[in-house]
């Protein structure tokens, strides 16, 4: 049995950060990861030609100071997401090309409705206390309704409704009917509002990392060194008055405390002895992840740029719901990323890969022309079926969950502590939130031990 000061379960950005900060503080650590790689819900693949592809989380934006601090720590630069040229909105088969945030070529009524709803969402999200959204003045009311119901009652134009539902529900990779309005407002608020949540320039997708997210998580793992143990899915955590014992199939770790830094759906698969408190157990049962495909399509060059397009497009109901330019800072080859979320992701998952590819490429030809039909490579990542992700990219709260069980998100259960982007009060749902949660949990366990030994 390996004996250490602290054990960390999960080597995504939350777990890596927690283990790194503990080790830097002079503590002994064992970091156990179920996969044969680190990164969690981020995953950078480097092709034979040296081009890197982010198959998971990829962007950084304003206010995401903790992931940027890690980038600075390891000397990793970023570059701006490509936004030159026109974006495209496809509604009822008609293409609207536009600059800025809203396609002004749509009817004035639709544009006005979009703007009004955006403004209202921004005002509502400002009322959410980030550390305790369940204490908001209207928490009970908002937690009793779904995002879908709220949009239906507050969006007068069908095109505006469909666009907003696609954009907002996509953030939770689930149908809007599955997501609590309180949770949606909380997640918006944690990032600074709906403009940040959905924005590219100066928003959540403002910049990309040179070399991909792997350029950050690889040196973190290297510094953690032989304290990192891959291919060790944790099956059981026992705690007693003196510490915890964490067990995988062929490894046991004894520690004073453990940080569980895996998605909520995966944390629910671990056996805890004694059982977790009821509220935490019920939280595990009630915060699912969604369905998402992230498909990177590689071309000789980003031909859409020559055609005056940014590569950004959105088409409610389409099997290629959202696209964005994912080319590297080298500008060649061109990479177009297709993101498909929620019910549509589940539906295209029923196709075989060849049919899915034909369907996606046909959609892209309709938007970007015949050149889109002949890629060099087609790389799809289905996070829905990732064994140790449990879906993607964020666990969401259905109605009633935050007001009943929200306080259990961060509350330690004896010697078991929790990390992961869902537990972050700031930037919940982003890589930055994962980093923040790891730093918080590392500080928390060390502080608890100082108090217990004082």
Functional labels for PLM-detected ranges:
Residues 5, 17, 25, 99-100, ...:
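Conserved flavin/dinucleotide-binding core of flavoenzymes
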Residues 51-123:
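Dinucleotide-binding Rossmann-like beta1-alpha1 core, especially the glycine-rich loop
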Residues 4-31:
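N-terminal Rossmann-like FAD-binding beta1-loop-alpha1 element of flavoenzymes
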Residues 238-253:
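Conserved beta-strand-loop-beta-strand element in the redox core of flavoprotein oxidoreductases
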Residues 23-48:
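Glycine-rich FAD pyrophosphate-binding loop
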Residues 260-278:
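Flavin (primarily FAD) binding-site architecture
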Residues 129-233, 240-243, 261, 271, ...:
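Active-site/ligand-binding neighborhood in enzyme catalytic cores
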Residues 7-9, 32, 234, 252-266:
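Short hydrophobic core segments
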């Amino acid at each position: 049995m390996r004996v250490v000061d602290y054990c960390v379960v999960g080597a995504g950005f939350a777990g890596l950060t927690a283990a790194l900060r503990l080790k830097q503080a002079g503590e002994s650590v064992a970091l156990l990861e179920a996969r044969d790689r680190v990164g969690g819900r981020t995953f950078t693949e480097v092709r034979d030609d040296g081009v890197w592809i982010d198959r998971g989380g990829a962007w950084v934006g304003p206010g995401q100071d903790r992931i940027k601090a890690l980038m600075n720590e390891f000397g990793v630069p970023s570059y701006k997401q490509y936004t030159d040229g026109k974006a495209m909105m496809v509604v009822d088969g008609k293409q609207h090309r536009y600059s800025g945030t809203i396609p002004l070529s749509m009817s004035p009524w639709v544009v006005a409705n979009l703007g009004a709803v955006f403004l209202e969402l921004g005002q509502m999200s400002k009322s959410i206390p980030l550390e305790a959204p369940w204490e908001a003045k209207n928490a009970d009311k908002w937690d009793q309704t779904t995002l879908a119901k709220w949009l239906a009652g507050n969006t007068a134009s069908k095109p505006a409704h469909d666009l907003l539902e696609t954009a907002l529900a996509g953030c939770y990779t689930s149908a809007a009917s599955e997501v609590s309005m309180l949770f949606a407002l909380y997640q918006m608020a944690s990032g600074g509002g709906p403009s940040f949540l959905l924005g590219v320039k100066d928003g959540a997708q403002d910049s990309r990392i040179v070399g991909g997210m792997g350029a950050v998580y690889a040196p973190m793992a290297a510094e953690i060194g032989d304290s990192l143990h891959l291919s060790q899915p944790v099956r059981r955590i026992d705690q007693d008055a003196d510490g915890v014992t964490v067990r995988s199939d062929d490894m046991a770790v004894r520690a004073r405390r453990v940080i569980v830094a895996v998605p909520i759906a995966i944390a629910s698969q671990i056996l805890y002895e004694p059982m977790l408190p009821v509220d935490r157990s019920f939280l595990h049962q009630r915060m699912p992840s969604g369905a998402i495909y992230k498909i990177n399509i590689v071309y000789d060059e980003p031909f859409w740029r020559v055609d005056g397009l940014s590569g950004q497009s959105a088409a409610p109901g389409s099997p290629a719901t959202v696209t964005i330019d994912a080319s590297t800072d080298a500008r060649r080859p061109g990479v177009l990323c297709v993101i498909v979320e929620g019910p549509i992701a589940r539906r295209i998952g029923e196709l075989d890969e060849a049919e899915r590819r034909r369907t996606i490429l046909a959609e892209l030809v309709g938007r970007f022309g015949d050149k889109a039909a002949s890629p060099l490579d087609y790389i799809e990542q289905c996070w829905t079926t990732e064994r140790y992700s449990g879906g993607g990219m964020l666990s969401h709260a259905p109605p009633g969950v935050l007001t009943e069980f929200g306080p259990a998100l961060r509350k330690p259960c004896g010697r078991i502590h929790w990390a992961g982007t869902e537990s972050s009060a700031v930037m919940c749902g982003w890589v930055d939130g994962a980093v923040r949660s790891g730093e918080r949990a590392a500080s928390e366990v060390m502080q608890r031990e100082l108090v217990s030994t004082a």
